Structures are given as C-alpha cells and as structure tokens.
From Swiss-Prot:
Family that this chain belongs to: Belongs to the eIF-1A family.
UniProt xrefs under CDD domains: S1_IF1A
S1-like domain mapped to chain residues: 19-91
GO molecular function, one term: RNA binding
Keyword list, A-Z: Initiation factor, Protein biosynthesis
Organism, as annotated: Pyrobaculum aerophilum (strain ATCC 51768 / DSM 7523 / JCM 9630 / CIP 104966 / NBRC 100827 / IM2)
GO BP: any one term: translational initiation
Described purpose of this protein according to its UniProt entry: Seems to be required for maximal rate of protein biosynthesis. Enhances ribosome dissociation into subunits and stabilizes the binding of the initiator Met-tRNA(I) to 40 S ribosomal subunits.
Any one GO CC term of the record: cytoplasm
Any Pfam family matching the protein: eIF-1a
Name the record gives this protein: Translation initiation factor 1A
Length: 114
C-alpha cells in the first residue's frame, strides 16, 4: 500500500510537470539529441549550431527517457558554456506547439544540422 502511494506521488508530480508547456528561459537553449554517450550523458546540437555534451540530472534519470532525435531544453553551465544539463524533454505534440509559438526557425535549423 505504501509503495503504491509513493508511485502515485511520483507519477502525479511527473504528469503535472509535463502538462505545463515550457519555453527556454534565461541561460537555457533549445537542442536536439543526436547521440547517447552513456552514463546519463548525451551529445546535443543546440539552436546556436554548437554541439554540446549535456547530462541528465539524477532526479530525472528514471522519469525521462531520451533517444536520438528528441527535442530538449539544455540549461548551460555558468562556468563551462560547452556543457549543460537537460532540464526538459518535448513530446511530439509539443514540438508543433513550439513552432506555433515562434520557434519554427530554430527547429528547422536543428533539423538541418542533424
């Protein structure tokens, strides 16, 4: 019974976080996963054309499954702009919403890079 409560707690927290539409904020950039490196690290091509190594934080490792071709938000590190953390994954329907909200050029650029 207690285990079910814990599972439902994490499921509700994950679903509520994923239901809100999120745009890249200050210090964040839109990216596309191009390669899985292992150990929670991914090679991501960002909207500015740079290829960065981004890691998936431990709090998201079991909740967020990524594969090549997924669109993500990368929070760049302050001390090393060549690396960052993946903080959000966009679903397929969210990519269409991104295009409607003015990120169509960035998505087309990411598709042309990859």
């Amino acid at each position: 019974m207690a285990r079910l409560r814990i599972i439902n707690f994490y499921r509700s927290a994950y679903c509520s976080a994923m239901s809100e539409f999120r745009l890249p904020g200050e210090g964040e950039i839109l990216g596309k996963v191009i390669e899985m490196l292992g150990d929670g690290r991914f090679k991501v091509i960002c909207a500015d054309g740079q290829i960065r190594v981004a890691r998936l934080p431990g709090r998201l490792r079991r909740r967020l499954w990524l594969k090549a071709g997924d669109y993500v938000i990368v929070a760049l590190w302050d001390f090393d702009r060549e690396k960052g953390d993946i903080v959000h994954k966009y679903e397929k329907r969210d990519v269409e919403e991104l295009k409607r909200r003015g990120f169509a050029e960035a998505i087309e650029a990411l598709d042309s890079y990859a």
